[in-house]
């Protein structure tokens, strides 16, 4: 499963996709800038469980953020959650898309 997340000013939206691009689930969390990486991890893992998904099923993660205060905390939470490839959308990302 590929996990895609977007940190916006109000919400963190995310979804799980099969490797052929089919949406498995989508959800959102309030984007609270006071959350620690562990609190973000807890919330994400519990949302995955709500939809019957487990961190071990995640093979890759891609995320974007417009909230600099949350970006490093989310990155750390994702690294704790899975040992998969984590891509951050931003300048210099080599995505293969032109």
Predicted regions and their residues:
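Short glycine-rich, Thr/Ser-proximal phosphate-binding strand/loop in the N-terminal lobe
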Residues: 2-44
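Short beta-strand-loop/turn "lid" adjacent to the catalytic site in phosphate-handling enzymes
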Residues: 51-98
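Residue-level preference for the first positions of well-ordered beta-strands
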Residues: 1-2, 60
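Short, low-complexity, polar/charged sequence segments that are solvent-exposed and flexible
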Residues: 22-24, 45-49, 81-83
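Short hydrophobic/aromatic-rich motifs at helix boundaries and adjacent loops
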Residues: 16-18, 45-48, 87-91
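A short, N-terminal amphipathic alpha-helix
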Residues: 40-55
């Amino acid at each position: 499963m590929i996990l895609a997340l977007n940190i916006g000013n109000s919400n963190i939206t995310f979804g799980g996709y099969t490797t052929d691009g089919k949406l498995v689930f989508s959800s959102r969390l309030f984007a609270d800038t006071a959350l620690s990486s562990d609190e973000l991890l807890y919330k994400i893992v519990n949302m995955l469980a709500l939809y019957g998904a487990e961190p071990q099923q995640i093979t890759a993660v891609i995320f974007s953020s417009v909230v600099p205060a949350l970006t490093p905390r989310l990155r750390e939470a994702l690294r704790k959650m899975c040992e998969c490839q984590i891509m951050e959308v931003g300048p210099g990302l080599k995505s293969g898309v032109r």
